[in-house]
């Protein structure tokens, strides 16, 4: 399925939805490399529980999702019904159709029940080192594209910027809104509804994580059209892998792992070779994480899950303590 979760297909999707189960693993991936050498203990269960929590919050707000429930003891249950953290989730399946050689014309012919081939990104702030700043520097985007006169590092935005990238290509690339609409297979009305949808999801994530003292900086969602062409949120949502959060100014997201690897010689090779044919083999195996970093990140996922969902699934220190320990280890 992917580098961080596995898919068990119970019924293949066609024009009507299929049925499947996600198995959230302890694997992680950075820089589109694929599976990294270490496992982050309890990450899979933590992400599964957080995703279920947010899918149910979205449904309460009238937002459709492909979520059907968590699997515990062979039974499908709601979040409040499970006794322990699990790593398995039952979902409706849609078709995932990969464009051939960059040709997205097939998406204009599909009636429904397919993954929209976009990552939909919201940005509530512009941190130092943001990819958006780099794109503006290179002339690939400009503030006016997002309804702003300027975009600077450290900005907090009054309303979120909505941004797009490809989802089903070997290396994701950012898209203008017109490019995103063109490849998506969506009508004008559906595309406008998609932009409104990501803002609503952003608001719900912001509200929920603020209870744990976290700030929602930016994040991404994936969306599908169901068999009646209604938009629904799919995959995973509201987790530190999908979003970038901060706690007392400290990064709480997968970005921590990226930052660690940016200091390695392995990353220098990734930066030089990424996107070329066979680049993953050419860069070689990444170095493993030091034990204290691996354990600190593991506790970060555990504490995030406990405090955002309001249920103590994991025996872990408080988020504040975990952040303090990680600061010492990483800085």
From Swiss-Prot:
Keyword annotations of the record: ATP-binding, Ligase, Nucleotide-binding, Purine biosynthesis
A Gene Ontology biological process term: 'de novo' IMP biosynthetic process
GO cellular component, one term: cytoplasm
Reaction(s) the record says it catalyses: 5-amino-1-(5-phospho-D-ribosyl)imidazole-4-carboxylate + L-aspartate + ATP = (2S)-2-[5-amino-1-(5-phospho-beta-D-ribosyl)imidazole-4-carboxamido]succinate + ADP + phosphate + 2 H(+)
InterPro entries: SAICAR_synt/ADE2_N, SAICAR_synth
Enzyme Commission identifier(s): 6.3.2.6
Claim: Metal-binding is one of the keywords in the record: no
Pathway: Purine metabolism; IMP biosynthesis via de novo pathway; 5-amino-1-(5-phospho-D-ribosyl)imidazole-4-carboxamide from 5-amino-1-(5-phospho-D-ribosyl)imidazole-4-carboxylate: step 1/2
GO molecular function: ATP binding; phosphoribosylaminoimidazolesuccinocarboxamide synthase activity
Pfam families: SAICAR_synt
Family: Belongs to the SAICAR synthetase family. Highly divergent.
Protein name: Putative phosphoribosylaminoimidazole-succinocarboxamide synthase
Organism this protein belongs to: Archaeoglobus fulgidus (strain ATCC 49558 / DSM 4304 / JCM 9628 / NBRC 100126 / VC-16)
